[in-house]
């Protein structure tokens, strides 16, 4: 969904405190290639709307200086690795934290293969060669390692779910629009919460169901993926999974 000015104001008024927008390139061809659009013109149109959305979010009160507005980019080796520096430059100009995401095998339809993963360390090295960086670290239960530009140009973050899994302290639980709870982004199935929501809400039962789900979770998909080919880097996907469009990021 592209963010318009009115929607941004409505979300802010409703109590939303932060927004992350996604952009995988800074030219029409790159955007089209990564989004599966018809051509450079279609990609350029989407790029224009994303740049406008950044302005709408800022005007609505989502302040990037307070971490309320960030920019995500998924990077693949042959798809948009050439966009690393342009994306970093755009984020620096806009005062946004750029969050680079390793290409992940979420779902079953994105054509994921290990060879297309551009490791976080390589992404950081490429950007750091242009604008020197110093590490900030990864917050407890956080998904991204963070770096600070030494020239004061803001921060860079990288989600290294493939090459540096963080399953051990992950505390993410996702609930889909149709009421199913997933305790891992890479899960194949979840727990249906609707029995505690319909025909009337059972708050105590819902709380107990969520507590039981969390205490019983054994999710460590990213760690298990690496164990398939120990010492050889990224392993192959393990099993079918729910699609990202269904789960959310």
Residue spans for each PLM region:
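Conserved strand-turn element in the central/C-terminal portion of the radical SAM core barrel
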Residues: 28, 38, 53-87, 100-111
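A short acidic, helix-capping loop that chelates divalent metal ions and anchors anionic groups
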Residues: 5, 27-35, 107-111, 192-194
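Auxiliary Fe-S-binding modules of radical SAM enzymes
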Residues: 86-93, 103-249
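Canonical radical SAM enzyme core domain
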Residues: 1-18, 23-30, 40-49, 73-86, ...
């Amino acid at each position: 969904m592209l963010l318009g000015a009115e929607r941004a104001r409505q979300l802010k008024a409703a109590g939303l405190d932060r927004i992350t927008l996604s952009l995988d390139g800074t030219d029409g061809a790159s955007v089209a290639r990564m989004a599966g659009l018809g051509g450079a013109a279609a990609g350029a149109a989407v790029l224009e709307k994303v740049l406008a959305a950044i302005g709408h979010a800022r005007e609505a009160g989502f302040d990037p200086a307070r971490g309320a507005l960030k920019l995500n980019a998924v990077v693949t080796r042959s798809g948009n690795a050439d966009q690393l520096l342009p994306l970093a430059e755009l984020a620096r100009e806009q005062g946004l934290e750029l969050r680079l995401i390793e290409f992940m095998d979420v779902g079953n339809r994105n054509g994921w293969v290990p060879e297309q993963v551009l490791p976080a360390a390589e992404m950081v090295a490429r950007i750091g060669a242009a604008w020197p960086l110093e590490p900030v670290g990864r917050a407890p239960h956080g998904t991204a390692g963070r770096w600070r530009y030494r020239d004061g140009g803001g921060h860079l973050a990288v989600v290294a779910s493939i090459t540096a899994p963080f399953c051990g302290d992950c505390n993410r639980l996702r609930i889909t629009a149709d009421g199913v709870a997933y305790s891992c982004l890479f899960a194949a199935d979840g727990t249906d919460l609707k029995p505690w929501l319909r025909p009337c809400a059972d708050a105590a039962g819902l709380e107990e169901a969520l507590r039981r789900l969390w205490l019983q979770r054994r999710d460590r998909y990213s760690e298990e993926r690496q164990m398939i080919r120990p010492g050889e880097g990224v392993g192959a996907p393990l099993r079918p999974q729910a699609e990202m469009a269904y789960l959310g990021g």
